[in-house]
Amino acid sequence: MGLIQLQNKTGWMLVEPVLKCNHNDVMKEDIRPDTPQPCPVARSLDVIGDRWSLLIVRDAFDGISRFGDFQRSLGAARNILADRLRRLVEAGILETRPAAEGSAYLEYVLTAQGLELFPVIVALRQWGEGHLFAPGEAHSLLLDRQTGLPVAPMLPRGGDGRALLPGQTVVQKID
């Protein structure tokens, strides 16, 4: 397989593609539900890969915790929202707690496992900010509360701290 060109904010670069997962072999529709996915990306998508689940997680990071508030923010049908919240609780991404003021309402809050999705949400947001809006088009921007400055771009880093590009990584199977 030859080099491919990828564009980033600084221009074009040549990278050698590295096969991460054979996506044709792990399409969810093509395998039985009880068959474990061989790829961490595929397994992650099984848990949080649909639109509503990721948006629920995004809203939870933004402080939303009640069913009605999720519904107002997302505009999702009640049955779909209830299903996704249930799945996220079952997956250990969210947990339910009694509402703070002691009412009969439940709140959905991120677990430690759910909090680890913050870099995923930030990376998706930054990619969207950089690629899905026309110049001058209004959109939200993630800012550092302390400085008021935009959050620095998310970059994978090596164990020594240097930024890594796609051609500088390799997937190794662990048995």
What role is predicted for each listed range?
Residues 23-45:
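Short, Lys/Arg-enriched N-terminal segment that forms or immediately precedes the first helix
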Residues 44, 54, 91, 120-131:
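Alpha-helical linker/hinge and terminal dimerization helices associated
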Residues 49, 100-121:
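Basic, amphipathic "hinge/linker" alpha-helix immediately C-terminal to the N-terminal HTH DNA-binding motif
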Residues 67, 71-99, 103:
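Canonical helix-turn-helix DNA-binding module
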